[in-house]
């Protein structure tokens, strides 16, 4: 199946339990899938959320604030799914494949949101740079933690450095973004991403 930006958005489960806030985030996710973030209006969000503009402004001051919250929660959910998919006692090659497989699973479920995170968030300006950086830092820490698992330790593979983790994060994000933009099957990146990640981790182990 070809994966493109028209695929259905996955449900959003923000930390806040407020039902209207959750519905508004889901409404934005649906509108991004339907027409993209830039063309989405608050009217679109409340239409999908089946609520009112008044309710929207009780939760968020702007479309941008809602977008940032959506991406924050989506990022945390993705990390949670990746961590849950990795068996820390498995051979480290297998752990890398499990992590990348889970990453691709999430992209398949909500390609438009992931693409917005990579492409559209930076265009909002310097005020959201800290949000994007925090998301990247969370991914870096996840990779460092995974590479500290027993499966890596058994083969004397040291934990990934922050620099190595950043290279992996940046490369995977860009590869995934280009694949989605080209309306290709994102599963096609798995073998290449796994091979590149294994090679980079192995090279790092040799130089440490």
Language model features: what each stretch is:
Residues 1-19, 154-156, 205-208:
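N-terminal intrinsically disordered/low-complexity leader segments
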Residues 69, 83-109, 164, 190:
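Hydrophobic alpha-helical connector segments
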Residues 23, 28-65, 69:
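Helix-turn-helix
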Residues 118, 150-196, 204-208:
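Hydrophobic/aromatic-rich alpha-helical bundle segments in the mid-to-C-terminal region
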Residues 105, 112-141, 156-158:
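Short secondary-structure transition hinges
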Residues 23, 27-34, 77-88, 171-182:
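Solvent-exposed, amphipathic alpha-helical segments
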Residues 76-79, 126-152, 162-170, 174, ...:
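Amphipathic alpha-helical packing segments from all-alpha helical-bundle domains
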Residues 27-31, 106, 142:
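Short amphipathic alpha-helical elements of helix-turn-helix/winged-helix folds
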């Amino acid at each position: 199946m070809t994966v493109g930006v028209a695929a259905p958005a996955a449900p959003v489960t923000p930390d806040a339990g407020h039902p209207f806030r959750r519905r508004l985030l889901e409404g934005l996710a649906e509108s991004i899938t339907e027409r993209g973030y830039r063309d989405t209006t608050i009217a679109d969000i409340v239409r999908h959320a089946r609520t009112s503009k008044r309710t929207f402004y009780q939760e968020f001051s702007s479309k941008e604030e809602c977008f940032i919250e959506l991406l924050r929660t989506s990022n945390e959910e993705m990390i949670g799914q990746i961590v849950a998919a990795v068996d820390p006692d498995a051979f480290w090659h297998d752990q890398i494949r499990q992590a990348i497989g889970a990453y691709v699973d999430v992209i398949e479920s909500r390609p438009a949101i992931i693409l917005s995170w990579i492409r559209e968030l930076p265009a909002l300006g310097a005020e959201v740079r800290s949000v994007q950086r925090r998301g990247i830092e969370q991914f870096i820490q996840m990779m460092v933690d995974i590479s500290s698992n027993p499966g890596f330790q058994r083969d004397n593979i040291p934990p990934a450095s922050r620099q190595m983790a950043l290279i992996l994060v940046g490369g995977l994000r860009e590869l995934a973004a280009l694949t989605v933009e080209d309306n290709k099957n994102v599963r096609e990146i798995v073998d290449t991403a796994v091979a590149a990640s294994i090679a980079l981790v192995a090279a790092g182990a040799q130089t440490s």
